[in-house]
């Protein structure tokens, strides 16, 4: 598993980040959508997915 940081914004353009452990980028996004209900309905608000290097 790798460590990912998912950056997203809300409707007022406030920036947020959530960290997830996942096997790949797709899974990291899916975990973020489970943990942040807003993202489940608004996945287009995800701005970036960064793989953290060890």
Regions flagged by a language model, labelled:
Residues 9-11, 27, 39-41:
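Intrinsic low-complexity/disordered segments
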Residues 3, 27-28:
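Generic alpha-helical structural signal
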Residues 1-16:
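Short aromatic-glycine-(Arg/Gly/Cys) micro-motifs in beta-strand/loop hairpins
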Residues 30, 34-54:
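Short, mixed-charge low-complexity intrinsically disordered segments
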Residues 12-17, 45, 49:
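Generic detector of bulky aromatic hydrophobic side chains
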Residues 13-27:
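A short, exposed loop/beta-hairpin motif centered on an aromatic-Gly-Thr core
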């Amino acid at each position: 598993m790798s460590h990912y940081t998912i950056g997203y914004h809300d409707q007022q353009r406030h920036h947020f980040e959530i960290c997830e452990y996942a096997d790949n980028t797709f899974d990291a996004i899916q975990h973020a959508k489970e943990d942040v209900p807003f993202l489940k309905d608004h996945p287009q608000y995800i701005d970036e997915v960064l793989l953290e290097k060890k």
